[in-house]
Swiss-Prot record:
UniProt-recorded name of the protein: Cytochrome c oxidase assembly protein COX16 homolog, mitochondrial
Compartments reported by the entry: Mitochondrion inner membrane
UniProt source species: Bos taurus (Bovine)
TM ranges: 15-37
Main location: mitochondrion
Mitochondrial intermembrane side: 38-107
Amino acid sequence: MFGYAVRRALRKSKTLRYGVPMLLLIVGGSFGLREFSQIRYDAVKIKIDPELEKKLKMNKVSLESEYEKIKDSTFDDWKNIRGPRPWEDPDLLQGRNPEILKTNKTT
């Protein structure tokens, strides 16, 4: 009889029903996140091969270097062409006649 009363009281208790699972989730989640964040610190400790590091430094690209490459380019003949939507025919949209393209491909 006493066991039944205790089980009934525990079942009705909102703290045990909602509070304890919430606390378990918070505490368990913090331990889980600690493990995932530890991966970041472990990855920083790994040293890169010196030869690979030299290659990475050689291929470094900056905004200024890319600007110097395209600075002298002319864009006078540039034409903005909208890309086709999935239901549209790309040849018709870009002003190309598909029948002319077929004859050019066959000859």
